[in-house]
């Protein structure tokens, strides 16, 4: 499993030191966000996916709305890992609901790359904003307005990228380490 993660660029092995999770640079995160914008907006604009998903649209909307409820519960709680996972998994769930299995795998990789950055820098406020964006995207899909859904997705990904960039610039690396270890020190 670690070899597969290494091949995908998520972990690295250091001789005589062990395995480490790769911390993507801001430039690598920007590349992943650019790819996500192209893929996700294109996926939403392909309205044939809504017609050919093999599921009634209402079932798709119901599943996506349940996912958003799960996101809201995680945001209200204290489990940052679950919150971060669910916010990223919305995009994979969306591709899955629209019947696009190939994009599910691609989005898992892309969201994993951006999730690494988000877990370092995303605030609870940013998480709430992302969840609200997801709800707006689903509302546009419920109205069968794929162009609006695609535009909402572009704005959402841009907002997340922008917020992470500002947070990354404002956080001292030592302070970030201190904050991440704070739950362990009592």
Question: Where on the chain are the PLM-derived regions?
Answer:
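Short linear motifs at protein or domain termini
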Residues: 1-49, 165-186
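Mobile beta-alpha loop/short-helix "lid" or hinge segments that flank ligand
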Residues: 7, 11-12, 110-112, 126-127
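Conserved amphipathic alpha-helical segments that form helical-bundle/coiled-coil interaction surfaces
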Residues: 27, 32, 36, 54-119, ...
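Alpha-solenoid helical repeat scaffolds
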Residues: 42, 116-117, 162
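Short alpha-helical functional segments enriched in proximate histidine and acidic residues
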Residues: 46, 93, 97, 163
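Short helix-capping/hinge motifs at transmembrane helix termini and TM-loop junctions
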Residues: 48-49, 99, 123-124
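C-terminal regulatory/effector modules of DNA-binding transcriptional regulators
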Residues: 123-186
